Swiss-Prot record:
Belongs to the protein kinase superfamily. CMGC Ser/Thr protein kinase family. RCK subfamily. This is Serine/threonine-protein kinase dyf-5. Residues 366-385, 452-489 are annotated as: Disordered. It comes from Caenorhabditis elegans. The gene is dyf-5. It is found in: Perikaryon; Cell projection, Dendrite; Cell projection, Axon; Cell projection, Cilium. Keywords: ATP-binding, Cell projection, Cilium, Cilium biogenesis/degradation, Kinase, Magnesium, Metal-binding, Nucleotide-binding, Serine/threonine-protein kinase, Transferase. The active site is at residue 132.
Amino acid sequence: MSSAVKLADRYLMTKRLGDGTFGEVMLAKKIDTGDRVAIKRMKKKFYSWEEAMSLREVKSLKKLNHPNIIKLREVIRENDILYFVFEFMQENLYELMKDRDRYFPESVIRNIIYQVLQGLAFMHKNGFFHRDMKPENIMCNGTELVKIADFGLAREIRSKPPYTDYVSTRWYRAPEILLRSTSYNSPIDMWALGCIMAELYILRPLFPGTSEMDQLFKIISILGTPNKDEWPEGYQLASAMNFRFQQVVATPMEQVVNTISKEGMKLMMDMMLWNPEKRPNANQSLRYKYFQVAEKLGAPVVSQPAPGSIRKTSAASVKSDTKAMTAKAAKKDYIGSENVSPQQPAKVIDRHINRNLPLNKETLFEKSDNKPLGPTKSNEAKPTAKEIYLSKSKYVPGQVSKDTHQNQIMTTNGLTGTTKTTTFSAKKEGRTAVQTRFEYAYGYIPSFGARQTGPTVSNQTNNHSANNSHSPNKMSNTGRVDWAAKYVK
């Protein structure tokens, strides 16, 4: 780790791989050896080495040297800009899943989960937990080698709470975090891995919530309402934020993840127990029967691709998988989740899997018949599932837009046929405590905090005021509960 070495003297930047909140990542080649590396350029400026070395990511990665944890090769500070030089991996787990045209064999999923657990066990043993486990933060060289990456949110287990409550991507966020706990610990990594494990089987997120409250509702709709005796702390957290658990019967997980073995189901469900204290830790998880199989598990001996090797893309990986499955099917000794006829080799379809389909009987609850996932209508380049998902409108009835200062609401009086257009002007900042709590509990901001301006009434009649009993500050919206009126009583 040095500030005297110039980046341009040692590395040749080739292309941009991605951009995040804290920095951008570039693909580069080491000039003297030809090795490919990933260089993360931090957006924040660092004016001393002491400041740079105090970063959580540096502190954790300096202590964590493991085959299933991404290796930090060096740190370079140049012109007050900090560069992290990491070993290069071909892709992340999300990219590996979205390029699939068929389900993974369970043996492949088992090996991926085994390697992630090995990395987590080492991390937790050395006093750190990740806090942001998700498919994008698990780097891959095909399905053979996986490594945990992005330790920007990592925490020391022995550090004292309270912690910041906004951690981890929502779809993989543990319920204690959704309920605003500030004393969580390493079990949140186990919950996230349980969600990732389910996603590897069904190739779409298990709990794709659109907000924090919707995330909780989606978890409850599948796992059922937690028992108060089973998790009393959860009910205390819910009460503190004015949230009430809906009484819902659990959906049989066999209907949701229907290609998993009994041993895999046991591990996955235990990692997603409501009570964090009852979830197995990483070491305990590695001793489950799911991993007691007659096959080699773990990282291969060679973890870094040869300097001059050509990157094997996900599409190429799918083609290789198809060829191998066809050959094995011809010998009648292949056991897996794919069913390929030796007379008609499986055709690899360049398609994009919609991993964000709703969880219903037409998508997940159907029984798997081991068929490929099917083609799309076009081979044109398509946006990723996450881009499609995030681009959709997140309109919630009654919500005041964060991007506009004025909203118009049209209401119709059913008795007179008159139409009233009301313009509300609301500030982005300075929400009342009532509005804030309401947003936490229900996922939208009630309109009673907005200032009403310029009401206009069309088609007025003489008997309009007699038939319309609404006050000027109330709105008629058929089919909706007037939460505002209830709240201000």
